[in-house]
């Protein structure tokens, strides 16, 4: 089903963006 695939892709993208933001915030706090 394309709906499940697109939903999984959107979830994966959101997770990647969230983790990237968290890593960026932690790096800024470390400096």
Swiss-Prot record:
It comes from the Eukaryota. The keyword Membrane applies. The chain crosses the membrane at residues 4-24. GO terms for cellular component: chloroplast thylakoid membrane; cytochrome b6f complex. The keyword Lyase does not apply. One of its GO terms (biological process) is photosynthesis. Keywords: Chloroplast, Electron transport, Membrane, Photosynthesis, Plastid, Thylakoid, Transmembrane, Transmembrane helix, Transport. Its main location: plastid. It is found in: Plastid, Chloroplast thylakoid membrane. GO terms for molecular function: electron transporter, transferring electrons within cytochrome b6/f complex of photosystem II activity. It is a single-pass membrane protein. The 4 large subunits of the cytochrome b6-f complex are cytochrome b6, subunit IV (17 kDa polypeptide, PetD), cytochrome f and the Rieske protein, while the 4 small subunits are PetG, PetL, PetM and PetN. The complex functions as a dimer. PANTHER family: CYTOCHROME B6-F COMPLEX SUBUNIT 6. Belongs to the PetL family. Component of the cytochrome b6-f complex, which mediates electron transfer between photosystem II (PSII) and photosystem I (PSI), cyclic electron flow around PSI, and state transitions. PetL is important for photoautotrophic growth as well as for electron transfer efficiency and stability of the cytochrome b6-f complex. This is Cytochrome b6-f complex subunit 6. It comes from Piper cenocladum (Ant piper). The gene is petL.
């Amino acid at each position: 089903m394309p709906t499940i695939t697109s939903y999984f892709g959107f979830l994966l993208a959101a997770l990647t963006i969230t983790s990237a933001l968290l890593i960026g915030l932690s790096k800024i706090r470390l400096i």
